[in-house]
Regions:
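Hydrophobic alpha-helix/TM-entry signal in multi-pass membrane transporters
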Residues: 1-5, 70, 95, 132
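Helix-to-loop junctions at the C-terminal end of transmembrane segments
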Residues: 51-65, 154
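C-terminal transmembrane helical hairpin of 12-TM major facilitator-type secondary transporters
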Residues: 64-116
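Multi-pass alpha-helical transporter architecture, strongest
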Residues: 159-187
């Protein structure tokens, strides 16, 4: 449960920041007047809506292994976010496309991640209630700690260091997904 929560904290850090704190900071440091923070929020969200619909329509019909799916989507969501942040100064349209792809892969795994506890062996309603209570509490505590630390890094070490911290902090998600049990057997 704690591993699941810690991983979720890293996921939330990547997931919430481009919708709240990050766009304004990126706009201040992009050196590109074409970059608009509201379009970063919009493109991540639109990609996310499409990703959620994709996941709901496609993944529930397929019997696939969860860990490889979550790892691949985790790498892609972080990779596309990193590319979007790299291109924001030189090619704003490409950065918006990258943010949208990040949103797609971010949100398309969300239903799979949140349903994983239901697929664990010997799971019952009492265990699920306790697990999700701990999961949400620790997940958001980790996110809050990362967000606070990110703001300190931004204020004391600068923009580039804060972006590196943001991406590295998000990697905790992938690291902890590697420790999850696989709930679907290999065919």
């Amino acid at each position: 449960i704690y591993v699941f929560s810690l991983g979720f904290g890293g996921f939330l850090f990547l997931y919430v920041m481009p919708l709240v704190s990050l766009p304004r900071v990126v706009a201040e440091h992009a050196h590109n007047s074409s970059f608009k923070p509201e379009f970063m929020i919009l493109t991540v969200t639109l990609g996310g809506i499409i990703g959620t619909l994709f996941s709901l329509m496609v993944t529930r019909k397929l019997n696939f292994r969860r860990k490889p799916f979550l790892i691949a989507h985790g790498v892609l969501m972080i990779g596309f976010m990193a590319l979007g942040l790299i291109f924001v100064s030189t090619n704003v349209v490409l950065s918006y496309v990258m943010f949208s792809l990040s949103g797609f892969f971010m949100y398309s795994q969300y239903p799979v991640y949140l349903n994983l506890p239901y697929e664990l062996p010997n799971m019952n309603s009492q265990r699920l209630t306790i697990m999700f209570g701990i999961f949400w509490a620790f997940g958001y505590a980790i996110y809050t700690l990362f967000n606070f630390t990110w703001s300190l890094v931004l204020n004391h070490l600068g923009y580039n260091s804060s972006i590196i911290f943001y991406l590295l902090g998000s990697l905790i998600y992938i690291i902890f997904v590697f420790t999850f049990p696989e709930t679907r057997s290999k065919k």
